């Protein structure tokens, strides 16, 4: 199959997802539609609507854009079917219902910013740095019912220096991931796409580290930990969302301080 014969629908929202979409467009792949989050209210009183980075890029390339509030909405599903996708690609979007990920004849694959099955979840880059890992990477895998558990198609590895913060690792994985997305599509075009169950990558589920969503309280520094753990914790949250601690003034007032 030739590049232009494969109809691709792309799904993503933040900056991390722009690089992969850009690689597909500039590589001459046939992106027939882009799905992203609805514009969100910003500014005073939410009077201004801000488009996602993916939407901004898609519009600049004259790509059709859909922004569903609900992924099971029949009107959206009808529009999605009308795009007649052969393949869907997901990068930093949201959990998809089966009616969506099972729609194309070649299925839907996701780019995840870890070496799956390690760090399944919403914040894999942060947790790899917080835990002091010396290596991470990116994985493409097929979507299935359980989040981040589908068969692995391909992986790339990235070393983490002990001076790297999460921003540095994020940007490196963003670039590496874009290359992996196009490589994965090429495997499909060449008829060489073999996917391996994640169970073949570990013996004991206890070996797996999760990557849950990070909340404000998660970012509070525990000064009772060893210095190395505190150092890794801070760089794993820098520059965003930022580790923090509390300063108590002589008068008893408290102030939160971000630590980078």
Place the predicted regions along the sequence by residue.
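N-terminal Rossmann-like dinucleotide-binding module
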Residues: 1-45
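Surface-exposed, charge/polar-rich loops and edge strands
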Residues: 4-5, 168, 218
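Internal alpha/beta domain cores that form substrate/cofactor-binding pockets in large enzymes
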Residues: 9, 32-35, 64-83, 88, ...
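Structural motif corresponding to alpha-helix initiation and N-cap regions
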Residues: 18, 51, 73-77, 94, ...
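Donor/substrate-binding cores of folate-linked one-carbon enzymes
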Residues: 27, 87-210
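N-terminal beta-loop-helix "entrance" segment that forms/cooperates
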Residues: 40-59
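Internal anion-binding site segments
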Residues: 203-260
């Amino acid at each position: 199959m030739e590049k232009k014969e494969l109809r691709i629908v792309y799904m993503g929202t933040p900056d991390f997802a722009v690089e992969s979409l850009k690689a597909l467009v500039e590589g001459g792949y046939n992106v027939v539609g882009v799905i992203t989050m609805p514009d969100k209210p910003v500014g005073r009183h939410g009077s201004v609507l801000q488009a996602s980075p993916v939407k901004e890029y898609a519009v600049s390339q004259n790509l059709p854009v859909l922004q569903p509030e609900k992924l099971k909405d029949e009107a959206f599903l009808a529009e999605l079917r009308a795009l007649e996708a052969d393949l869907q690609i997901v990068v930093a979007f949201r959990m998809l219902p089966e009616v969506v990920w099972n729609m194309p004849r070649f299925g839907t694959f996701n780019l995840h910013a870890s070496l799956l099955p390690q760090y399944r979840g919403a914040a894999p880059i942060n947790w790899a740095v917080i835990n002091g890992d010396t290596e991470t990477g990116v994985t493409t895998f097929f979507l299935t019912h359980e989040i981040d558990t589908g068969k692995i198609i391909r992986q790339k590895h990235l070393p983490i220096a002990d001076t790297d913060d999460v921003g540095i690792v994020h940007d490196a994985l963003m670039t590496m991931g874009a290359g992996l997305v196009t490589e994965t599509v090429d495997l499909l075009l060449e008829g060489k796409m073999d996917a391996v169950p994640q169970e073949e990558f570990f013996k004991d589920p206890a070996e797996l580290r999760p990557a849950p969503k990070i909340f404000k309280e998660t970012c509070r520094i525990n000064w009772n930990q060893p210095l190395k753990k505190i150092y890794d914790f801070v760089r794993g949250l820098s520059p965003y969302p930022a580790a923090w601690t509390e300063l108590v003034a002589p008068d008893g007032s408290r102030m939160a301080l971000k630590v980078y």
